[in-house]
Amino acid sequence: MKIVIVGIGKVGRALAEHLSKEGHDVAVIDNRPGIAERLAEELDVLGIEGNGAAYTVQQQARAGQADLVIAATDGDEVNMIACMTAKKLGAKNTIARVRSAEYEGQLRFMQQEMGLSLSINPERETARDIARILRFPAVAKVETFAKGRVE
């Protein structure tokens, strides 16, 4: 799969490492000087320095031909705009990390009208996992199968 990752923080870096090891064609974008270039030297990925929400930067990363664009910067708005831009360029699927509770009620709109395939709030997902464990303590041990798609 052709995958573009916007934002090379902890999440973006971990995704790039994992996906490139699986043999995917990965491009990474980060606006901090040298970050994308260093990661490209470490991993088999294309590294691009720039604003991941910018049309021209996404064109460099070939986001329009991507099967998946993942926006995992620290900025919710940057992530949403990056995904909207990628979708307009032709990306098949987009995932945005959206942490602010302010956007909770707008997720359906963002998916239907703005082209987001999926939005993920890591804090909300963690809270749900903890609540599930508290309801069913015997389920505290979770095994993953099918490359993490089934728990």
Regions found by a protein language model. Give the residues of each.
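Cytosolic regulatory regions of ion transport systems
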Residues: M1-E151
